Amino acid sequence: MKPATSELVATLPPELFGSGYPYLDIRNTAYLAALWEEPVTYVVQFAQALDSVTAGYFLSCYIERYRPDEWVSLNEDIVRHETGLGRGRWYKVRDTLLNAGILTNERDIGVSMYRLNGDKLESLLRQHADLSLCAIAAAPVSLNRLHLKTLLHHGLSFKACLLLAVVQADTPHTALADRQAYSPWVPLPEQVVTERTFLSRTEQRRAAEDLRNIGVLETKYDGFPRIRHSRYSLQRLAELSDSYMQSLTV
């Protein structure tokens, strides 16, 4: 039986493997790691509790990786590597969480240490988040980390990445041999997207515009009542992802 990775490795550029020892080169390791990263499960209730989509995303990543009450060393580089958020976004999210009392910050020999206050987070969730059975049981939005980091790398906001993730989640699976340059059109009503992501209608319009400007998303309104439909360009997303991954090997 072939190893599970044999087919994946065969699809990578030959120059990536050099003399046959790809794992000895840190650039190659970064390239492979970008391919195999697990998706992020976005918890919309975190965004509702904090009144911030980006802070909700950061908490989704944080809780997936660290335990409550665990002291964690965080800085710009660590946050960028683990979440894709740049310096400005990280500091804004950090201030939001510190002001809400969810994160505690201490410095230990010049290193910033952070700890999550689980009780405070639970209190905010009970006050501000939709904890109904329907909301809790609804399928969460899953973000492809490679696509997320690709779009952030090319200057888009996390909100644009989140909107694309909703389109991808609603797109029916298509066999690789049958895929076209664009995905099929799928309905994307604004209110439904708000319920699943906490993105306002204005934020959705801006995110869609940013995705259209970079050539990733197309939208149209059909039917009666008129409903927004969207599709994304697999070809353009692949080009942007390749550009981002090439930057990891420079």
How would you name each of these model-derived features?
Residues 1-78, 95-102, 111-112, 116-191:
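Short recognition helix of helix-turn-helix/winged-helix DNA-binding domains
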Residues 76-87, 190-201:
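Short helix-coil junctions and helix-kink-helix linkers
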Residues 85-96, 199-210:
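Short amphipathic alpha-helical interaction segments
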Residues 98-108, 212-222:
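A short, conserved structural fragment
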Residues 107-113, 221-230:
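Short, Lys/Arg-rich nucleic-acid/phosphate-binding segment
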Residues 119-126, 235-243:
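Short, charged/polar, Gly/Pro-enriched secondary-structure boundary elements
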Residues 155, 189-196, 206, 210-219:
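Mid-protein regulatory/catalytic core that forms ligand/cofactor-binding pockets
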